[in-house]
Structures are given as C-alpha cells and as structure tokens.
C-alpha cells in the first residue's frame, strides 16, 4: 500500500486528486515547513543570485521519497521568478531528448530532473558542458560526413533530485554547486503540516487526530497528506465531517497502517526475515523473492524507515532484524548462543 503513497503524482492520483495535491504544496520558502538548515541556506543562495542577476548554482536534492524534493524545486523556481521545466532521468533516453529541453530554456530558467541517478551515461556526459559552459555539441549527419556544431544555451539552473545519491557518478556530482540532503520529519512538525493541509481542504481536524496521523506517517509529508485525504473520506462517511481521534484511528486501521506507522509490506518483510531466515542475516535479493517485491523498491522505499526506526540493520552479510522488530511483532527473540568459556 505505501508504495502507492510514494509514487510520483502522475502515477498516483486521478486528475481531480492531482489538483488537490498541487493545492497542498507550499509555494514559497515561508510556507515550507521543516528542513530549516537547508531552507536557511537556499534563501541566501537564491537572494544572492538574484542580486547579482546570475543563475543560481546547480542544485542537488537527495534523500528518501516524499520529503519535498519536487516541492522545493518549484519553490526555488518561484523565488527566482523563473519558469521551470520538469522531466526525469528515465525519460531522457538520448541526447536529442535533453537538447530539446535545454535549447528551449530562457535565461535563469530552472530545469528539474527527477531520478537523476537513472540518466544513461551518454545523456549524462552530454549534460556536462551544458552545466559548466552553457553549451552543447550537436552531431549532424553520420558516418564519414558526421560533424558537430556547438550551440550556446541561455544560462540556467539544473536541479537534480534523487533517492540514491550514491549512484551518481563523481563527475556529475561535482558539477552541483549546492548539495542538500533532506531528512525525515518528526511528529510535531508533521502535525503542523497535517493541520495546514486540513485547512486548505476545508476539513476540520482535532489536534489529537492530526498528531495521530502525523506520528504514523513515517516522517514523510507526502504520506501524511495522503493519509489525511483518506481519513477525510472516513470522516465524511462515518462521522460529521470533522476528523476526530476516533475517526483517525478507524481510518488508519482500515488502511493497514499500524500503531508505529508500519504497513503490510513493512511487517511482511520483518516477519519473513524472522520466520524464514531466523532473523537474518539474509541478502536483499532473497528477501525480495520471498515477499514478491522488487529489490530496488525494498531498498528505496521500505528499508530506509525500517533502519531509521531501528527495526532492521544492514551488516556485511546481509539484513538482520533487531530486538525491536521482535518486540513489535510480539515474537520471542532466539536465545543467544553461549560462548566457549561459559
């Protein structure tokens, strides 16, 4: 279920829900909650670039899904009073795809590339000269008649977003002048986000209910907003339209989001490691096969929170559950084997 919560907007929402999702997104630095250090720095960098009349340095935003990388990119564009073009790494299959975007950028525009770690190597190399010198080389003809011409580009800012910064090549990473990692949110801050979103949705919500949704949202604003929208449905049908603590708990139980914010797949991963592999260590690909999920999805979507909260750990030999996982699942940990001298 939670993988749906973490998909991109185009994959996840109907046309009506897309409009609601966009309406919930903050449009300025002042509206954006959390990530205070990053915001403080970005305000300075954007303000200085505007004063000098220069494009903002290229920006790399990385961190787990749903923390606001796309939202921040749009905010940066708004604060620069510029237009933004949005694409993603897998879409840019050949240099011509990238060239079409770059040549249509106006001065100080923003080009946002989501999942930039998935750029193929040919397109990535083509991007280097565009980022450094605002120039690209285009090949004309082929074979013996092949020749290249250089085309100048308007100065622009590239914002790359990724959940897996470690997969970026060193040459690409080095070309970003601004590098920011977004971190998970605490429940108190997420409560503010839930309350703000409920106001925008014209849905009354009690503070206790907002906190209940927030603390089960895995530290992720996108999940908090999605749970809020679904809880609003329950309040409308099973209540009087106000989201109370009781309604929130009913909705979250129906959505299979447990007391600690873990969903079916989270618990399935932990249970599988305990029941089939004696708590680990076990390899990622083996876990993926056992739970019928893609290894990449487990690594990007599920593992970060399980590790962050202390249910799972990575070792040199594979993944292992922790005592907290046994406690959460109400299981008895295996007895520790004795040492040689006991």
Swiss-Prot record:
Highest rank taxon of the organism: Bacteria
Positions that bind ATP: 24-25, 66, 69-71, 132-134, 175, 185, 222
Catalytic reaction list: ATP + H2O = ADP + phosphate + H(+)
Major location category of this protein: cytoplasm
Cellular compartment(s): Cytoplasm
GO molecular function terms noted in the UniProt entry: ATP binding; ATP hydrolysis activity; four-way junction DNA binding; four-way junction helicase activity
Region named Small ATPAse domain (RuvB-S): 186-256
Cross-referenced InterPro entries: AAA+_ATPase, AAA_lid_4, DNA_helicase_Holl-junc_RuvB, P-loop_NTPase, RuvB-like_N, RuvB_C, WH-like_DNA-bd_sf, WH_DNA-bd_sf
Enzyme Commission number, as recorded: 3.6.4.-
Stretch list, region Head domain (RuvB-H): 259-342
GO cellular component: cytoplasm; Holliday junction resolvase complex
Keywords: ATP-binding, Cytoplasm, DNA damage, DNA recombination, DNA repair, DNA-binding, Hydrolase, Nucleotide-binding
Chain sites annotated for binding Mg(2+): 70
Residues given in the record as DNA binding sites: 314, 319
One GO biological process term: DNA recombination
Coiled-coil ranges per UniProt: none
Record-linked Gene3D superfamilies: 1.10.8.60, P-loop containing nucleotide triphosphate hydrolases, Winged helix-like DNA-binding domain superfamily/Winged helix DNA-binding domain
Enzyme class (EC, first level): hydrolase
DNA repair is among the record's keywords: yes
Segments for region (Large ATPase domain (RuvB-L)): 1-185
Subunit: Homohexamer. Forms an RuvA(8)-RuvB(12)-Holliday junction (HJ) complex. HJ DNA is sandwiched between 2 RuvA tetramers; dsDNA enters through RuvA and exits via RuvB. An RuvB hexamer assembles on each DNA strand where it exits the tetramer. Each RuvB hexamer is contacted by two RuvA subunits (via domain III) on 2 adjacent RuvB subunits; this complex drives branch migration. In the full resolvosome a probable DNA-RuvA(4)-RuvB(12)-RuvC(2) complex forms which resolves the HJ.
Biological role stated in the UniProt entry: The RuvA-RuvB-RuvC complex processes Holliday junction (HJ) DNA during genetic recombination and DNA repair, while the RuvA-RuvB complex plays an important role in the rescue of blocked DNA replication forks via replication fork reversal (RFR). RuvA specifically binds to HJ cruciform DNA, conferring on it an open structure. The RuvB hexamer acts as an ATP-dependent pump, pulling dsDNA into and through the RuvAB complex. RuvB forms 2 homohexamers on either side of HJ DNA bound by 1 or 2 RuvA tetramers; 4 subunits per hexamer contact DNA at a time.
Family per similarity comment: Belongs to the RuvB family.
Domain notes: Has 3 domains, the large (RuvB-L) and small ATPase (RuvB-S) domains and the C-terminal head (RuvB-H) domain. The head domain binds DNA, while the ATPase domains jointly bind ATP, ADP or are empty depending on the state of the subunit in the translocation cycle. During a single DNA translocation step the structure of each domain remains the same, but their relative positions change.
Protein name: Holliday junction branch migration complex subunit RuvB
């Amino acid at each position: 279920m939670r993988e749906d919560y973490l998909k991109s907007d185009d994959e996840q929402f109907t046309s009506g829900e897309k409009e609601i999702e966009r309406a919930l997104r903050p449009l300025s630095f002042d509206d954006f909650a959390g990530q205070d250090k990053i915001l403080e720095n970005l305000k300075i960098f954007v303000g200085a670039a505007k004063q000098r009349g220069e494009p903002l340095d290229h920006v790399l935003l990385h961190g787990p899904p749903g923390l606001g990388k796309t939202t921040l990119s749009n905010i940066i564009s708004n604060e620069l009073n510029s237009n933004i073009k949005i694409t993603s790494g897998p879409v840019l299959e050949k240099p011509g795809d990238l060239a079409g975007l770059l040549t249509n950028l106006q001065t100080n525009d923003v080009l946002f590339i989501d999942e930039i770690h998935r750029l193929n190597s040919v397109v990535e190399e083509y991007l280097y000269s565009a980022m450094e010198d605002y120039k690209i080389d285009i090949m004309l003809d082929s074979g013996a008649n092949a020749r290249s011409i250089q085309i100048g580009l308007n100065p622009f800012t590239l914002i790359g977003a990724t959940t897996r910064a470690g997969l970026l090549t060193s040459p690409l990473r080095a070309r970003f002048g601004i590098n920011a990692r977004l971190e998970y949110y605490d429940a108190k801050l997420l409560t503010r986000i839930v309350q703000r979103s409920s106001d925008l949705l014209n849905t009354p919500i009690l503070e206790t209910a907002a906190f209940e949704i927030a603390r089960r949202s895995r530290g992720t604003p996108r999940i908090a907003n999605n749970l809020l929208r679904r809880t609003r449905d329950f309040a409308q049908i099973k209540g009087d339209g106000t989201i109370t603590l009781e309604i929130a708990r009913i909705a979250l139980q129906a959505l299979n989001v447990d007391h600690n914010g873990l969903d079916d797949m989270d618990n399935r991963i932990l249970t599988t490691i305990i029941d089939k592999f004696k708590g680990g260590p076990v390899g990622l690909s083996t876990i993926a096969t056992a739970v019928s999920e893609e290894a990449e999805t487990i690594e990007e979507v599920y593992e970060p929170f399980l590790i962050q909260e202390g249910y799972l750990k990575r070792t040199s030999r594979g993944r292992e559950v922790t005592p907290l996982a046994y406690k959460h699942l109400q299981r008895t940990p295996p007895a520790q084997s004795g040492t040689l001298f006991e």
